Amino acid sequence: MIYHDLRDFVAQLEKMGELKRIATEVDPRLEMTEIADRVLRAGGPALLFEHPKGHRVPVLANLFGTVKRVALGMGEDDPARLREVGKLLAYLKEPEPPKGLRDAWDKWPVLKQVLNMAPKEVRSAPCQEMVWEGKDVDLSRLPIQHCWPGDVAPLITWGLTVTRGPHKKRQNLGIYRQQVIGPNKLIMRWLAHRGGALDFREHQQAHPGEAFPVAVALGADPATILGAVTPVPDTLSEYQFAGLLRGAKTEVVRCLGNTLQVPASSEIVLEGVIHPEETALEGPYGDHTGYYNEQETFPVFTVERITMRRDPIYHSTYTGKPPDEPAILGVALNEVFVPLLQKQFPEIVDFYLPPEGCSYRMAVVSMKKAYPGHAKRVMFGVWSFLRQFMYTKFILVTDDDVDVRDWKEVMWALTTRVDPARDTLLVENTPIDYLDFASPVSGLGSKMGIDATNKWPGETQREWGTPITMDAAVKARVDAIWQDLGL
């Protein structure tokens, strides 16, 4: 199904019973978080708070609180179809040359579609129907959530930050949380390896001392939002990928104060700059780890202009101990990751990021083992293949007879096939999430790989155990008489 903008998605979700309007006045400070958290844990609907306390702008929360709604946002009615999205990305990441005329003919529609999905720039857009400038720019007029009691200030969570490096044609879309520190000031918390931070660094090198243009789009259409959190190949822009998902070009409009292009249907857009020398201490905030994080220094984003649709919707979320919305997104994107990994490592059978592992900190992989040491190759492959797995602390590899999504089977393999000294791999001084306070140094820590596969000659000197299985004929006989047993 195609959704033209966020409002269209909201309307369709409401028809499906996947969205609930809340008419009762609810405070953006703490109350919305508590309500959204209870609903998410129950597998409930998206929420539209129509009367946020002290504000006229409604708040949309828990939008991607189920795997089904993530799939719907990507244009798929069935979550199982997310594997097809992954296959498309795998092909676009490493396209294979045609094997013949027929193969070329079969692949041409996909290639043609990609070529035709460059974003379409429009002159006027809904996101610029209303404009706040000068003294009218006041972030307190927006119902920005204050999520947890220990949070230092309200926090923008679902903003799509748009940047462009000085030597790049394509823009970068990233989602970075932003702490409110004044009527027109936000702290831009982007990590050093993320696209926005890299663009900013390159701009500083190319134009020392000059302000860096930034735009933040709130309430874009679901395909564009999800495109910003999906491992899109570097050769493809997030806008192109969003166009592929919805089957129509992404309409963008140039900002009023700079040349950056933002989704034309966005509900709210923040335009402004980052001055190279202006930084501030960010946090503490409750995060997806379930803890409050440390304070760190990040650049300050000065908002010079706010544009919006008439009667805008403010899109928001919270992060906390799993499950939260990022954890659910991780489960859904898990299905996208599998074909990408299998394209590079055909021996991988399945890949699972347990939501309890804070979205990405632990991965369980099943594989068709072909030689001694094969599991270690897969571990290093997963760590290095996609940027999304740079911060994965634990990788556990099993044979293909283990269902990696069944924790009972994983524990059985772990406790029967692993010798801790032989089968545990430790890698020190690797990049670690700055929010991971367990590491001895901020941003730098160790990783562990666990080989829970059956061991081959060369890996063990002992005779390896044979799994117990019942005789097939006996099982068939018992199946035949089962109803007669009265059990």
Curated annotation (Swiss-Prot):
SS bond list: none
Catalytic activity: a 4-hydroxy-3-(all-trans-polyprenyl)benzoate + H(+) = a 2-(all-trans-polyprenyl)phenol + CO2
GO biological process: ubiquinone biosynthetic process
Pfam families tied to this protein: UbiD, UbiD_C, UbiD_N
Superkingdom in the source lineage: Bacteria
Topology term for the membrane: Peripheral membrane protein
GO molecular function: 3-octaprenyl-4-hydroxybenzoate carboxy-lyase activity; metal ion binding
EC number: 4.1.1.98
Provenance organism: Thiobacillus denitrificans (strain ATCC 25259 / T1)
Key words, A-Z: Cell membrane, Decarboxylase, Flavoprotein, FMN, Lyase, Manganese, Membrane, Metal-binding, Ubiquinone biosynthesis
Gene symbol of the encoding locus: ubiD
Cofactor note: Binds 1 prenylated FMN per subunit.
GO (cellular component) term, any one: plasma membrane
UniProt pathway annotation: Cofactor biosynthesis; ubiquinone biosynthesis
Name of the protein in its database record: 3-octaprenyl-4-hydroxybenzoate carboxy-lyase
Assembly and interaction partners: Homohexamer.
Binding positions for Mn(2+) per the UniProt entry: 172, 238
Chief location: membrane
Localization in the cell: Cell membrane
Active site: 287 (proton donor)
Listed cofactors: prenylated FMN; Mn(2+)
HAMAP family in alphabetical order: UbiD
Binding site for prenylated FMN: 175-177, 189-191, 194-195
Record function comment: Catalyzes the decarboxylation of 3-octaprenyl-4-hydroxy benzoate to 2-octaprenylphenol, an intermediate step in ubiquinone biosynthesis.
SUPFAM superfamilies to which the protein is assigned, alphabetical: FMN-binding split barrel (SSF50475), UbiD C-terminal domain-like (SSF143968)
Sequence similarity: Belongs to the UbiD family.
